[in-house]
């Protein structure tokens, strides 16, 4: 069931030089209980989109519908109550430095008028959920970055929200702490059936826990789909760049090696293999060597784990009789391994 739906959303801001269009014709659907990623570089429109989702901005055109309500049409009082069902965490934590961990988590409940004893018991539950037992009386200055973000997550969950918006929530963290926070978000999603929307510029974050992703550029969603499908076959240049940064960090070196091997072995073929799921577990190289009497030189490869399974790419050179090479390529395709001849065709 769709929990969030954006239909033909446009957002303009007025400036000295005239109107600036931050979002153009955005269509987006997030299912209840999903972990949905939105990725883009700075200026793509991600932050504006977040502000539309929590009702801090209204669209110039189009509809932002959450739980069946067009939130732009809600009166102020109803909008304030509605916002209680949306939690949010940020890159820079936004904790009150004069309050302890427990007091920071109690803050939204205090604002909502929840009795003090109920506030305390709820905060203690959340401290246990996010793994901060024993740090209840610590102040933010005494916490690591990862612990501060855990406090931020607990505070965002205080009012039992249905949606958690994460705006660059791991950007200020080191890689290990990032993974720990992502694992916590995955745990919360599974245990509470909480819908999570992740805004990020890091493909690692998307790969690690998201089911679907929207790729944004210049205020538009240029590509959208299951994470594993985007990794398998990105359709846009920006999606390809994100995936290359994450999965193929030595792509320039690969291209140079391919050029050198094309010169050294003009009769062979350079082939890029892309495989996923069960194909990633198959002994593909030994199979084609034995079955088709070809020689295989491995240039470079990698396997990336997504939430929906492994995605691997491998650059190889096939050497041998022409008919054997062509048969090997056809055999790979029959195994449902996506095969692209990139040299010596």
Curated annotation (Swiss-Prot):
Residues in ABC transporter domain copies: 4-243
Binding site for ATP: 40-47
Keyword Mitochondrion assigned: no
Compartment list: Cell membrane
Pfam families associated with the record: ABC_tran, NIL
Gene Ontology terms for molecular function: ABC-type D-methionine transporter activity; ATP binding; ATP hydrolysis activity
EC number: 7.4.2.11
Catalytic activity: L-methionine(out) + ATP + H2O = L-methionine(in) + ADP + phosphate + H(+); D-methionine(out) + ATP + H2O = D-methionine(in) + ADP + phosphate + H(+)
Gene Ontology annotations for the cellular component aspect, listed alphabetically: plasma membrane
Domain of life of the organism encoding this protein: Bacteria
Keywords of this entry: Amino-acid transport, ATP-binding, Cell membrane, Membrane, Nucleotide-binding, Translocase, Transport
Membrane topology: Peripheral membrane protein
Keyword Membrane: yes
Subunit structure comment from the entry: The complex is composed of two ATP-binding proteins (MetN), two transmembrane proteins (MetI) and a solute-binding protein (MetQ).
Function: Part of the ABC transporter complex MetNIQ involved in methionine import. Responsible for energy coupling to the transport system.
Similarity remark: Belongs to the ABC transporter superfamily. Methionine importer (TC 3.A.1.24) family.
Protein name per the record: Methionine import ATP-binding protein MetN 2
Source organism per UniProt: Enterococcus faecalis (strain ATCC 700802 / V583)
Organism lineage string: Bacteria, Bacillati, Bacillota, Bacilli, Lactobacillales
């Amino acid at each position: 069931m769709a929990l969030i739906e954006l239909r033909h959303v446009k957002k303009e801001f007025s400036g000295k030089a005239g109107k600036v269009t931050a979002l153009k014709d955005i269509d987006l659907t997030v299912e209840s209980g999903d972990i949905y990623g939105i990725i883009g570089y700075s200026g793509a429109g991600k932050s504006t989109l977040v502000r539309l989702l929590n009702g801090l901005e209204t669209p110039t055109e189009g509809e932002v519908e959450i739980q069946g309500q067009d939130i732009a049409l809600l009166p102020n009082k109803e909008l304030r109550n509605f916002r209680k069902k949306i939690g949010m965490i940020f890159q820079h934590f936004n904790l009150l430095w004069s309050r302890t961990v427990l007091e920071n988590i109690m803050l939204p409940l205090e604002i909502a008028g929840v009795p003090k004893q109920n506030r305390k018991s709820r905060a203690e539950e959340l401290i246990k959920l996010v793994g901060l037992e024993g740090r209840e009386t610590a102040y933010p200055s005494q916490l690591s970055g990862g612990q501060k973000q855990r406090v931020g997550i607990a505070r965002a969950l205080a009012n039992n929200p249905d949606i958690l918006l994460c705006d660059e929530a791991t950007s200020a963290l080191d890689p290990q702490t990032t993974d720990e926070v992502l694992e916590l978000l995955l745990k919360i999603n599974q245990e509470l059936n909480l819908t999570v929307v992740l805004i990020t510029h890091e493909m690692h974050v998307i790969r690690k826990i998201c089911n679907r992703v929207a790729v944004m550029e210049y205020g538009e969603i240029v590509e959208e789909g299951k994470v594993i499908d985007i990794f398998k076959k990105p359709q846009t240049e920006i999606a390809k760049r994100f995936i290359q940064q994450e999965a193929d960090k030595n792509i320039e070196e690969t291209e140079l090696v391919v050029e050198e091997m094309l010169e050294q072995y003009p009769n062979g073929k350079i082939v890029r293999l892309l495989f996923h799921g069960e194909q990633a577990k198959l002994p593909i190289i030994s199979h084609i060597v034995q079955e088709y009497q070809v020689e295989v030189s491995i240039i470079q490869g990698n396997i990336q784990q997504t939430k929906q399974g492994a995605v691997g790419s491998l650059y190889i050179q096939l050497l041998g009789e022409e008919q054997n090479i062509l048969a090997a390529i056809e055999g790979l395709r029959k195994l449902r391994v996506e095969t692209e001849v990139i040299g010596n065709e």
